[in-house]
Amino acid sequence: MASQLPPYKQDFLKAAIAGVLKFGSFELKSKRISPYFFNAGDFYRADLLRAISLAYAHTVIEAREATGLDFDVVFGPAYKGIPLATSTTDKLAELDPARYGTTCYSFDRKEAKDHGEGGNIVGAPLKGQKVLIVDDVITAGTAKREAIAKIRKEGGEVVGIVVALDRMEKLPAADGDDSKPGPSALGEIKKEYGIPIFSILTLDDIIEGAKSFASAEDIKRTEEYRAKYKATD
């Protein structure tokens, strides 16, 4: 329930409602038509960016306290992950300067640069480093697999992923029959790579929080979507 969330998650949920959460009909990469869309690219206002970066930083700190999560570099996959990585690194240093005061960040280019410093990576070198990926959501998992492959190619070790939203959504069935139960992309990446994934909010949180401003029809459509596509993990 949104009312039971920690203050930083409540602030993030309010920011999401104010700036990035939209209801309507949105085609996803999976070709499903979602009744809601969460676009972290819309966190371009200073107050909204502060709310999301604080939420990421608090989530990271809680993950360290709960699981011992340890990392050297915060990595943001281009493009939406870039401001998330830089602002989260800054907020980590602000909240716990003794531990995170010298933490580095890095991000990738969509296309390798063949002049100047060259390469695919901007920011801290990844070789021999423990890397934490921060991004907005995991829907199909394709972008996260690409990011993991790039980090490994550079000699880094991915030790975890933090996302803003867990859609709690199962992967599309190989035979196109979405009536079958199935795992989420988030769960499959956890299993495939053996790394922990942490989320600030879940779809359940979004639905509960949206009841204060969304129409009854939007809430109903989102709840029906959740029931139809909810993952088994």
From Swiss-Prot:
GO cellular component, one term: cytoplasm
Family: Belongs to the purine/pyrimidine phosphoribosyltransferase family. PyrE subfamily.
Annotated keywords: Glycosyltransferase, Pyrimidine biosynthesis, Transferase
Pathway(s) of this molecule: Pyrimidine metabolism; UMP biosynthesis via de novo pathway; UMP from orotate: step 1/2
Reactions accelerated catalytically: orotidine 5'-phosphate + diphosphate = orotate + 5-phospho-alpha-D-ribose 1-diphosphate
Record's protein name: Orotate phosphoribosyltransferase
Subunit structure: Homodimer.
Function comment: Catalyzes the transfer of a ribosyl phosphate group from 5-phosphoribose 1-diphosphate to orotate, leading to the formation of orotidine monophosphate (OMP).
Protein's organism: Colletotrichum graminicola
Known EC number: 2.4.2.10
Top class in the EC scheme: transferase
Residues binding 5-phospho-alpha-D-ribose 1-diphosphate: 29, 79-80, 109-110, 113, 115, 135-143
Residue runs in coiled coils: none
Binding site for orotate: F37, F38, T139, R167
Record has Lyase as a keyword: no
PROSITE patterns per record: PUR_PYR_PR_TRANSFER (PS00103)
